[in-house]
């Protein structure tokens, strides 16, 4: 991370609840010093995401001048990620003094129909199935499955 010209460690932000399993595995294998923070954003009720985005856990780290990676399970419409990124760009913690140096988006799954630009993804161009397992849920259940499944399979 020092090769970036920024001596401070990067900050990885986990978007709860969906990204917690992916985030945990990712940070364990980073091999460099990092800071972590968590934000909880909700835009789905069941499989419906027509409501607005609400936050029930805010960022605590001052992100001023830092390289930030927002880690989520999936970017679907981009509504949740837009809201999260807006908070990150304001500097994170309520007492933040400025903006981050750089912000990247990391996802486990990227939809084929996705219109939101993702910087890093593990599974690009996935279909429109509703996934369960490995953090993905259906009405709050199934997150603890070790693998990802199509909920209708």
Task: Label each region the model flagged.
Residues 1-153:
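PRPP-associated nucleotide enzymes
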